[in-house]
């Protein structure tokens, strides 16, 4: 996977197992504990997962501002240096996992490795259009369409025909007019590089499983969650098409039966079924998604009850919210929950995601239960007041929601 999505996968793993998320977006130096006490001892925690299914997730470029008509006709569009979604020859892309129920047991295997001469445009859908990348490769454009023009001065003579060419990328070379920071989009900074024999499989995996924001996110989440312990209680949702804890009765519905329960057996299979079919349509209503997660913990009795009906006041709850960009469809009203806090948490802006994240952390979501959630203090100085304010710690013992937000 690309460097960006390698980080996302690591972050998802860290969030899912209750470890500290890496502070720097491209730092991979921190080791992630695979068996934290929060998951191996005591009551199983709740893990709520919300993924972005907005229309922009179908795009094959990042950041958003790249998609100008000028850039689409330049070499830079086909270089990972300029367009971070494009193929990176320095990364080994991994095929995600298929998780199925076979004879009553969960079986995990790799998805089929795509063929360089017959690669599906969507590796999760075996019926999607197949492309011979050795001769018919086209880069994806500003939306879901593929580029049908060769541009001016982009390719060597005779290589491209109506946008079709052998699979390739363009290598950025740093020089006086081609700076290392804020890379130039000028064609002269990039060198055409066809995909050689040793990179054909790697390119095909990128094309089928990582080419777009949605494909890459699904693959990163797939690889992050397939080893998640069974004693985590999981429910999932999307911004537009599936609500946290909706609990549809059919394992083949929009949510693939996402009733919160331990991440085992058919429930584990249901999650990966849903993940592989995540759609790409609509806006980015992040506030509503966070509110749905918090309200689920506040109002649904299943959030604190095991399947045998036992209810636990010490159960911790975590929410992972992933998105590719800025929110829209903001709720009405003027809410500034963090406006009364000390800096650096205080701000004067109302209706931000931080307001809702603070609200569902500070509010006792189940006042009828005793406050028995175990506080988290990995960093202590001996000064109790300061330790409680340290953002690396969590002093809350009431039922609350801890948010991990992942942005592209």
Outline where the language-model segments fall:
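Bacterial N-terminal signal peptides that target proteins for export
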Residues: 2-14
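P/S/T/G-enriched low-complexity
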Residues: 26-408
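Bacterial N-terminal signal peptides
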Residues: 12-24
């Amino acid at each position: 996977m690309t460097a960006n999505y390698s980080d996302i996968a690591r972050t998802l793993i860290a969030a899912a197992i209750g470890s500290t998320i890496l502070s720097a977006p491209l730092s991979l130096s921190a080791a992630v504990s695979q068996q934290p006490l929060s998951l191996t001892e005591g009551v199983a925690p709740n893990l709520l997962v919300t993924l972005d299914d907005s229309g922009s997730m179908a795009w094959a470029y990042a950041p958003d501002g790249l998609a100008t008509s000028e850039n689409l006709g330049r070499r830079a569009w086909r270089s990972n240096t300029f367009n971070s979604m494009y193929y990176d020859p320095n990364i080994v892309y991994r095929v995600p996992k298929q998780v199925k129920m076979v004879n009553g047991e969960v079986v995990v295997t790799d998805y089929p490795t795509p063929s360089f001469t017959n690669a599906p445009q969507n590796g999760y859908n075996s019926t999607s259009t197949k492309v011979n990348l050795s001769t018919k490769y086209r880069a994806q454009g500003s939306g879901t369409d593929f580029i049908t023009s060769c541009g001016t001065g982009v390719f060597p003579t005779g290589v491209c025909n109506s946008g079709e060419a052998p699979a390739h990328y363009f290598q950025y070379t740093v020089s006086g007019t081609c700076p290392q920071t804020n890379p130039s989009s000028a064609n002269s900074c990039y060198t055409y590089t066809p995909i050689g024999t040793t990179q054909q499989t790697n390119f095909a995996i990128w094309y089928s499983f990582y080419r777009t924001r949605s494909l890459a996110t699904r693959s990163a989440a797939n690889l992050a969650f397939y080893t998640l312990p069974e004693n985590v209680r999981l429910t999932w949702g999307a911004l537009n098409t599936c609500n946290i804890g909706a609990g549809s009765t059919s394992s083949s519905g929009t949510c693939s039966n996402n009733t919160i329960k331990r991440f085992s057996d058919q429930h584990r299979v249901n999650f990966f079924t849903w993940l592989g079919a995540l759609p790409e349509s609509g806006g980015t209503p992040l506030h509503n998604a966070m509110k749905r997660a918090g309200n689920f913990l506040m109002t649904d009795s299943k959030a604190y009850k095991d399947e045998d009906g036992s209810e636990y006041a010490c159960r911790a709850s975590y929410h992972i919210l992933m998105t590719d960009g800025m929110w829209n469809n903001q709720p009405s009203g003027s809410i500034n929950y963090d406006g009364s806090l000390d800096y650096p948490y205080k701000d004067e802006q109302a209706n931000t995601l931080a307001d809702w994240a603070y609200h569902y952390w500070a509010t006792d979501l189940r006042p009828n239960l005793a406050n028995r959630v175990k506080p988290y203090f990995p960093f202590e100085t001996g000064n109790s007041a300061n330790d409680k304010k340290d953002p690396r710690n969590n002093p809350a013992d009431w039922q609350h929601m801890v948010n991990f937000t992942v942005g592209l």
